[in-house]
Amino acid sequence: MNETTRRFARLVDLSAVQATSTEADVRACAELATRYNIISVHVLPCWTRFLSTLLPQQGTGEVMIGGPVGFPGGGHATDTKVQEVRQLIADGAREVDMVVNIGKVLSGDYDYVREDLRRVVEAAAPVPAKVILETHYLNEEQIRRVCDIAVEVGMKWVKTSTGWAPTGATVEKVSIIADQLKGRIDINVAGGISDLATVSALYQLGVRRFGMSHGAVTKVLAELEQHPERFPELNVD
């Protein structure tokens, strides 16, 4: 494994968070994450405890478990999201990815959004929390408002998408997020990230975490093993 491949693996949220994700998918993600020392594996809550039994058995101490909260629509009551956070952490999660209440954002109820995010951050601490915007449904003003709220309440990351909407991370929407955050907190993308060219383009915008499927990660890792020069940004010390 070359150094570029190693560095890329530490930028990856390996994800199996579709409704059809199976035990075999979770096992495959655990195996791939262990082999490449991928930074995290994200699964649906019903698989969190199971995943936590796989990773130690495979000898890794550096692969985190991530779990979704209010997934995928964000419309769960805040109390429900808080309980989800507590259960995920009890089951082994070391990151939580909360879906913003999309309907409240579209309604302009930013006081609700702020309190929703704040309580999840509070419940998760010291485990870092991310907020998923589901940018497919939000306009520029809404994206900018939620980014500012995320910073205000102590979110560690802003994430573009769940992977369940018609579109995921796009250069246009990520550019808006990057412009609004200005490095105050980090950017995580997900949804439709399937090739090295896309990863490289988004990395240049400031993205430092990529939510990707097993197939997509395998494809990019294989390309980097053969052609590390195609991601020159990771070759700079």
Question: Locations of the language-model features?
Answer:
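Conserved N-terminal beta1-alpha1 strand-loop-helix module at the mouth
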Residues: 1-90, 140-145, 149-152
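Glycine-rich phosphate-binding active-site loops on the catalytic face of alpha/beta enzymes
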Residues: 15, 67-72, 90-105, 152-167, ...
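A general structural detector for well-ordered alpha-helical segments in enzyme core domains, enriched
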Residues: 25-29, 84-85, 113-120, 146, ...
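Glycine-rich, proline-tolerant flexible connector loops at the mouths of alpha/beta enzymes
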Residues: 30, 34-50, 54, 96-114, ...
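Short, surface-exposed connector motifs at secondary-structure boundaries
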Residues: 30-38, 127-130, 154-159, 181-185, ...
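Alpha-helix-loop-beta-strand connector modules within alpha/beta enzyme cores
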Residues: 45, 49-71, 108-135, 144, ...
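Catalytic cores of alpha/beta
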Residues: 52, 76-87, 138-149, 176-183, ...
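Conserved strand-turn element in the central/C-terminal portion of the radical SAM core barrel
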Residues: 99-103, 129-138
